[in-house]
């Protein structure tokens, strides 16, 4: 349960950042649901092409000085999250505007800890009114662009508490935040993802926080006095950083982390793992995920689902395809597709092979050769190619293109059709091994 899966895990809403909690068959059999979280903070990001409202960025929200308005805005966002079966938005962003060259300043509220805390507390409370969690981030002290994933933020305790922690304290105590994301990099030499002082002493014991803590995506941790390394995850467990984000498959331990080895060596205990699991379960029991698993959908969600626009993509009901375990090929049967002008099909695919694929389209059209029939292909909502054929007068032809799927095992392929009178027999994705 320590490992979250992503990005774009097929176990939760399509195109989202991560799944956590009940993400194995064993845990699901125990009645533990899979929780879902999605980027923010400026609205919901779903990489499969599902529409969502784009919200004003954090700095603009700070400029309003209007907590009531911000709260109402994020109550609406909470309802949109419910519609898309997402349990937590990865936001608000709370880093202080220390360096004007920080490339992510637009996500954050201001240089003022009080304003930051109050605006973010309003966002948290707004989403809670819709039954949604929010993950306040990044905890804490990561405020520059150069070396953003590795820098060490050195500061006094007074500076830390009065500037860089104060906004988080307000969001927890006044807003009731139930999820926190730690940073990349370190504070005073210890990487925040494995800092017991931050994740337990201050956050939980001093502020009374009772939710979950997760890492930033692919963050590292270190043993005090040592360099941070990818396999070093046991300090996260000990610090009460409950969820490491993310791996492609939680059961197989693809990053070869040291949790089991350090458990056997007595460096961490089964009690610490159980404590962290309890935190995750507590979060899920208060989230929409538990109701979705039980098949209980509120009237508000049903109303919103019925109000979808005709061209909206329903991220919860996509066709899911998995590569053949022997050949690693992925076959998209033409019967699954709807090739007509203006239509789009989105499919969730899971590939074990990482690298280039030959994408072989078998298509025909009854039109004459003067006709042009384009099909645009998007991978994770990014345009990759357009395959255009002429009319074939009823003869099946094949067109082959190269598509790289070298990053991650879960993707969303969108096909957009620019013309009528096109028939697709199949689309076959074949790994390029030579």
Which functions belong to the PLM regions below?
Residues 1-352, 356-360, 374-398, 402-406, ...:
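Glycoside hydrolase catalytic-domain context in secreted enzymes
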Residues 84, 361-367, 418:
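Solvent-exposed strand-to-loop "edge" motifs in beta-rich extracellular domains
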Residues 366-376:
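Beta-strand acidic-aromatic groove motif in beta-rich domains, primarily in extracellular
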Residues 368, 392-396, 422-423:
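A short local loop/turn or secondary-structure capping micro-motif enriched for an aromatic residue
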Residues 414-422:
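Short beta-strand-plus-loop segments that form exposed binding edges in beta-rich domains
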């Amino acid at each position: 349960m320590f490992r979250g899966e992503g990005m774009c895990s097929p176990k939760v809403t399509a195109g989202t950042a991560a799944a956590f909690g009940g993400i194995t068959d064993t845990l699901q059999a125990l009645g533990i649901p899979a929780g879902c979280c999605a980027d923010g903070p400026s609205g919901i990001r779903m990489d499969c092409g599902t529409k969502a409202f784009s919200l004003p960025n954090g700095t603009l929200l700070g400029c309003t000085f209007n907590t009531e308005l911000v709260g109402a805005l994020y109550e609406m966002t909470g309802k949109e999250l419910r519609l898309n079966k997402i349990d937590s938005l990865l936001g608000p962003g709370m880093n202080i505007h220390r360096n004007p060259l920080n490339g992510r300043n637009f996500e954050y509220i201001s240089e003022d800890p009080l304003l930051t805390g109050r605006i973010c507390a309003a966002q948290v409370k707004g989403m809670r009114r819709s039954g949604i969690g929010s993950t306040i981030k990044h905890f804490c002290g990561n405020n520059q662009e150069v070396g953003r994933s590795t820098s060490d933020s050195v500061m006094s305790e007074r500076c830390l508490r009065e500037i860089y922690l104060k906004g988080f304290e307000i969001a927890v105590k006044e807003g009731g935040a139930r999820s926190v994301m730690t940073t990349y990099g370190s504070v005073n030499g210890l990487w925040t993802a494995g800092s017991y002082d931050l994740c337990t002493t201050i956050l939980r014991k001093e502020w009374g926080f009772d939710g979950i803590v997760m890492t930033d995506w692919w963050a590292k941790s270190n043993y005090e006095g040592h360099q941070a390394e990818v396999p070093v995850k046991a300090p996260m467990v000990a610090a009460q950083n409950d969820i490491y984000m993310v791996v492609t498959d939680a059961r197989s331990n693809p990053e070869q982390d040291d949790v089991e080895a350090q458990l056997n060596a007595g460096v961490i205990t089964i009690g610490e793992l159980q404590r962290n699991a309890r935190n995750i379960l507590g979060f899920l029991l208060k989230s929409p995920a538990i109701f979705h698993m039980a098949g209980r959908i509120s009237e508000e969600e049903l109303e919103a689902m019925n109000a979808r626009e005709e061209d909206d993509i329903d991220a919860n009901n996509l066709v899911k395809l998995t590569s053949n375990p022997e050949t690693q090929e992925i076959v998209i049967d033409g019967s699954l597709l709807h090739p007509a002008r203006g239509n789009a099909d989105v499919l969730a695919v899971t590939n074990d092979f990482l690298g280039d694929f030959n994408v072989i389209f078998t298509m025909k059209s009854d039109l004459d050769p003067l006709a042009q029939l384009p099909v645009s292909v998007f991978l994770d909502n990014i345009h990759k190619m357009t395959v255009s054929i002429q009319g074939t007068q009823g003869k099946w032809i094949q067109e082959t293109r190269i598509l790289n799927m070298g990053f991650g095992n879960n993707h969303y392929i969108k096909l957009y059709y620019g013309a009528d009178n096109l028939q697709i027999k199949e689309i076959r994705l074949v790994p390029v091994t030579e």
